């Protein structure tokens, strides 16, 4: 089941996006976040974020809803420190406290309702170890972003409510920052 249109997927697979991820997005999002040795990444899409994350921790488990994207990413990263699973972030197949950290990068807006977004946040809190951090980012609602998402799922996250939503999901401390047309968040279980 695809949650992105063709143009969006092409951009998220492009060298331009890879450069933005490595040089700007991940340094900003991960600033001050300790990933530990066992990272869960949800919604990696074609995996350009995964490519950077796998160099920052011993193990990465990537959960992707789209079966085709999950299969391609698993094939591309076979033999690496990344395990790719096709699955739903609102129903993760892992025991409580399994991961040292989680990354949720530019994907929350692809979850089709705030209630399901909250279910995803609660699942992420559940599978994190005590003291584990969720590091994430998302794009704000802009005309350009709406245009990029024509024909796919786009439910923007309100940064004004995100800290409270993270706490309700089971996180103790939460930080939310807005810069330009992006929001980053870090929450500790």
Where are these regions (language model features)?
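Class I SAM-dependent methyltransferase SAM/SAH-binding core
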Residues: 40, 45-91
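A short glycine-rich, Lys/Arg-flanked "PGG" loop and its adjoining helix->strand segment in the class I
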Residues: 118-130
């Amino acid at each position: 089941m695809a949650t992105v249109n063709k143009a969006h997927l092409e951009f998220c697979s492009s060298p331009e996006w890879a450069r933005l991820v490595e040089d700007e997005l991940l340094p900003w999002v991960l600033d001050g976040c300790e990933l530990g040795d066992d990272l869960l990444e949800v919604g990696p899409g074609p995996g350009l974020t995964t490519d950077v994350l796998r160099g920052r921790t011993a193990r990465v488990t990537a959960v992707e809803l789209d079966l085709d994207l999950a299969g391609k990413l698993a094939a591309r990263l076979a033999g690496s420190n990344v395990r790719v699973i096709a699955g739903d972030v609102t129903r993760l197949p892992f025991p409580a406290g399994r991961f040292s950290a989680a990354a949720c990068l530019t994907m929350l807006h692809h979850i089709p309702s705030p209630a399901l977004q909250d279910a995803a946040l609660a699942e992420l809190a559940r599978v994190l170890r005590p003291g584990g951090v969720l590091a994430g980012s998302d794009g704000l609602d802009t005309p350009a972003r709406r245009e990029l998402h024509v024909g796919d799922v786009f439910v923007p996250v309100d940064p004004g409510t995100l800290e409270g939503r993270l706490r309700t999901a089971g996180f103790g401390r939460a930080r939310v920052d807005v810069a330009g047309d992006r929001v980053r968040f870090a929450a500790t279980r």
